[in-house]
Swiss-Prot record:
PROSITE patterns: OMPDECASE (PS00156). GO terms for biological process: 'de novo' pyrimidine nucleobase biosynthetic process; 'de novo' UMP biosynthetic process. Pfam families: OMPdecase (PF00215). Coiled coil: none annotated. The keyword Transcription does not apply. It catalyses: orotidine 5'-phosphate + H(+) = UMP + CO2. Belongs to the OMP decarboxylase family. Type 2 subfamily. InterPro entries: Aldolase_TIM, OMPdecase_AS, OMPdecase_type-2, OMPdeCOase_dom, RibuloseP-bd_barrel. This is Orotidine 5'-phosphate decarboxylase. Its EC number is 4.1.1.23. It comes from Halobacterium salinarum (strain ATCC 700922 / JCM 11081 / NRC-1) (Halobacterium halobium). Pathway: Pyrimidine metabolism; UMP biosynthesis via de novo pathway; UMP from orotate: step 2/2.
Amino acid sequence: MSFVEELGARIEAADSVVSVGLDPDMERLPEDVQDAELPRWAFNRRIIDATHEHAAVFKPNAAFYEDSDGWRALRETVAYAHGKGVPVLLDAKRADIGNTARQYAEILAHVDAITVNPYLGEDALQPFLTQDEAGVFVLCRTSNEGGMDFQHLELAAYDRRLYEHVAERAAEWNAQYGDVGLVVGATAPDELQAIRERVPELPFLVPGVGAQGGDAEAAVEYGLNDDGVGLVNSTRGVIFAGEHGSAWAAAAGDAARTLRERLNRHR
C-alpha cells in the first residue's frame, strides 16, 4: 500500500485530518515526566494515549530529538504510534547531495513519511522519492513570516513565483515517483488556494492552525486533494493545551478532539 493510500485509510478510519505534532520541548515538559529515564518518551506516550483516536498522523519534529536520549525517545515514540495504528510523518526538512542524502533517507525504513527541502534540487531528493511506500512532503509555502524572503520571488523565466514553481515540480515528481505532497502554511490562505488550483492531486500538510493562528477553514478547503487526503497540523495548541495543569494529557486529548470536530465541519 502506498503512503497516500495508507493515509487515506487512516483518515477514513479516524474521521480526521488532524496531524498532531510531537515536539517535546524539554523546558515545557510537565513535572511528572521530568524524572523519567526518557522524559520526552514519557511525555509522548501520554500524549499519544490521549490523542490517537483523533489523529490521522503523528508528526515528530527531528530537532527535538537530536541527542542520544532523544533518538531513543523517538524510536520508542514511532513504535508506540504504529502500535496504535497511526502513521508517523517525521518533520526533518532533509535534503543534501550524494551519500549524505542517502543516509538521511534511511530513516524512511522506520517512519512512514518525511518533510524535505527542495532548494538543492531533484537529485538531492531522489533518495527519498525512490523509497517504496514512503511519503515525501516538499516545503512549498511555509507558515513563518520569513518565508516571504525567498518563496515569493518572481521567476522571470517561468512567469511564476518560486513557491508556485516548487508546487509544479512536486507534481512532476509525484507523477514519476508517487507519494509526493506539499507543505503549505495555513497562515497564507490566498497562496494556499492558489497552490491548490495548480496541483489539485497533491495532498498537503498544512501547519499553522494552532498556536500560529492560521485559517482552519481554508486549511481544510484547500489542504485536501481531490480524494479528501491531506493533513492539518497543530503542535503546541494540542500537546501543551494543559501545560499549567495536572491533567495535561487529558487537556491534549480534548484539544485534539476539538480540532478534529472544528476541521470536520469544513470537510
